[in-house]
Regions:
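Primarily NTPase-proximal linker/entry elements flanking Walker-type ATP/GTP-binding cores
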Residues: 5-138, 145-192
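Conserved beta-strand/loop subsegment of P-loop NTPase cores
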Residues: 134, 188-190, 215-222, 241-252, ...
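Conserved ATPase-coupling elements of RecA-like P-loop NTPase cores
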Residues: 145-146, 197-203, 230-232, 257
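Short, ordered loop/turn segments at secondary-structure junctions
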Residues: 138-141, 164-168, 192-195, 223-226, ...
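Active-site/ligand-binding-proximal alpha/beta "capping" segment
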Residues: 210, 230-248
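Inter-motif core of Ras-like GTPase G domains
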Residues: 203-224
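GTPase G-domain guanine-specificity segment
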Residues: 201, 233-235, 239, 251-260, ...
């Protein structure tokens, strides 16, 4: 993913003149090509525009360090700004998993990787933090969704809530809460159902589960190949449900995996952290 963007950016700065300070024309020439490279990588126009403006403001008029050329100076500024867009200035806060049992609600569209991510997250809590974790599938719509989580749980040695046919998502959430308390679990993860697109039924169901579980964290799982629509998905879920974090999956895909650039700055402005799986 990032290798493809790197290839697009290679050679962008060849035309910069060798002078002591960077003029606006020098910067504009290089950044015009950077913007094209971002747009070709499916980065949205608004995000590319904000990125270029931030770089231009920092680059124009800067005195070039003696040991580097103006082109190298601009490359460094672009690099630093790209790092900021992806990571921000501060380290992301740790997930709130104190005061057990701590509920974590997993939401997102169908096919984004919620179930697999739930298992990865549970395994991380178990292996790195020594936590006792319970997973529960609330997806009563997708065939074999509950069985999938059950299989993943057995593979990583994490307990899953026993399947009771005919239960609705709210009943499952309540049973998971009770089981987590009685079983001495540190964390319980609720894997909700997804849809191919955001609709009122999906949002209403997730909101109802949220009200029952009162989760410490509500994590939105987004497919890294979503591209420009990633921001719309994150905004919709945050407005209707309240999202505390975003998990991006399949980040080893093609150029559209640059959803990370799309989503990092808008979500950071909303106070939402994100992680990559």
């Amino acid at each position: 993913m990032f290798e493809s963007l790197s290839e697009r950016l290679s050679g962008v700065f060849d035309r910069l003149t060798k002078q002591g300070a960077l003029s606006e024309d020098d910067v504009k020439t290089a950044l015009r090509e950077v913007r094209v490279a971002l747009l070709e990588a499916d980065v949205s126009l608004s995000v590319a525009r904000d990125f270029i403006k931030a770089v231009q403001d920092k680059a124009t008029g800067q005195t070039v360090t003696k040991s580097v050329t103006p082109g190298q100076q601009v490359v460094k500024i672009v690099h630093d700004e790209l790092v900021y867009f992806l990571a921000g200035e501060e380290d992301p806060e740790k997930l709130k998993i104190d005061n057990p049992p701590a509920p974590i609600l997993m939401v997102g569209l169908q096919g984004s990787g919620k179930t697999t991510t739930s298992a990865k997250l549970a395994n991380r809590f178990k292996q790195k933090d020594g936590k006792k974790v319970l997973m529960a599938s609330l997806d009563v719509n997708r065939p074999a969704a509950m069985e999938q989580l059950q299989i993943l749980g057995s593979q990583i040695g994490v307990d899953t809530l026993p399947i009771v046919k005919g239960e609705d998502p709210l009943a499952i959430a309540k049973r998971a809460k009770t089981q987590a308390s009685l079983g001495g679990y540190d964390i319980y993860i609720l894997d909700t159902a997804g849809r191919l697109h955001i609709d009122q039924e999906l949002i209403a169901q997730a909101a109802a589960v949220r009200d029952v579980a009162n989760p410490r964290e509500t994590l939105l799982v987004v497919d890294g190949l979503t591209g420009q629509d990633a921001v719309n998905v994150a905004t919709e879920f945050d407005d209707k449900i309240g999202v505390t974090g975003v998990v991006l999956t399949r980040m080893d895909g093609d150029g559209r995996g640059l959803s990370l650039i799309h989503i990092s700055e808008p979500t950071r402005r909303r106070g939402i952290s994100y992680a990559v799986f």
